[in-house]
From Swiss-Prot:
Known outcome of mutating residue 36 to R: In allele FCGR3B*01
Predominant localisation class: membrane
GO cellular component: external side of plasma membrane; extracellular exosome; extracellular region; plasma membrane; secretory granule membrane
Molecular function as annotated in GO: GPI anchor binding; IgG binding; IgG receptor activity
Glycosylation (residues): 56, 63, 82, 92, 180, 187
Protein's UniProt keywords contain Membrane: yes
Protein name: Low affinity immunoglobulin gamma Fc region receptor III-B
Prodomain positions: 201-233
Post-translational modification: Glycosylated. Glycosylation plays an inhibitory role in the interaction with IgG3.
Top-level taxonomy: Eukaryota, Metazoa, Chordata, Craniata, Vertebrata
Chain's gene name: FCGR3B
Length: 233
């Protein structure tokens, strides 16, 4: 039994080896969630991926250029325009992530959102962000040139359930001291049908299946060895 089991087990162990197509794709997250920021803002990019016990390093890429940082989080302390671009990450047991775009703007105000395309009934979260978080008051959010929401003190604007009527061009304005400032205009689109995916789910089925198969086969080999030795005794 043992003589037959060992070659079969070894063959299956080799076939259970990880292939590139079996590896999960790494995912990049932004903290805070805004992918449009102002100069001097701090941004943290986090890489979610699978690691082996021997190697927990992370490869980061900015505009396809390798970044020296090997930590799972990449921290930008004071963003500049040069930090704009595509960011990707990869671990030794994950393939290269999809790109995440970071946009660094110059100005007093920036209208921020986690994305610009939503589906009907999605919640929409808008933020009128000031440079270096300077105090801002008498803030107005405008849609298609018309006042949509007013706050005496700066506050985020929430739309609980989006409708097709919420599509359009948006910007915000307010007072910094006595200076009247406005953000650039952005376009928000509301779609019908399936939800717009913003964060890829992370699930490494290929790795888990292969690992479980290896463990089962190792158990089978040990069991076969035990009975073989017992029979010989």
């Amino acid at each position: 039994m043992w003589q037959l089991l060992l070659p079969t087990a070894l063959l299956l162990l080799v076939s259970a080896g990880m292939r590139t197509e079996d590896l999960p794709k790494a995912v990049v997250f932004l903290e805070p969630q805004w992918y449009s920021v102002l100069e001097k803002d701090s941004v943290t990019l986090k890489c979610q991926g699978a690691y082996s016990p021997e190697d927990n390093s992370t490869q980061w890429f900015h505009n396809e250029n390798l970044i020296s940082s090997q930590a799972s989080s990449y921290f930008i302390d004071a963003a500049t325009v040069n930090d704009s671009g595509e960011y990707r990450c990869q671990t030794n047991l994950s393939t290269l992530s999809d790109p995440v775009q970071l946009e660094v703007h110059i100005g007093w105000l920036l209208l921020q959102a986690p994305r610009w395309v939503f589906k009907e009934e999605d919640p929409i979260h808008l933020r009128c962000h000031s440079w270096k978080n300077t105090a801002l008051h008498k803030v107005t959010y405008l849609q298609n040139g018309k006042d949509r929401k007013y706050f005496h003190h700066n506050s985020d604007f929430h739309i609980p359930k989006a409708t097709l009527k919420d599509s359009g061009s948006y910007f915000c304005r307010g007072l910094v001291g006595s200076k009247n400032v406005s953000s650039e205009t952005v376009n928000i689109t509301i779609t019908q049908g399936l939800a717009v995916s913003t964060i890829s789910s992370f699930s490494p089925p290929g790795y888990q299946v292969s690992f479980c198969l290896v463990m089962v086969l190792l158990f089978a080999v040990d069991t076969g060895l035990y009975f073989s030795v017992k029979t010989n005794i």
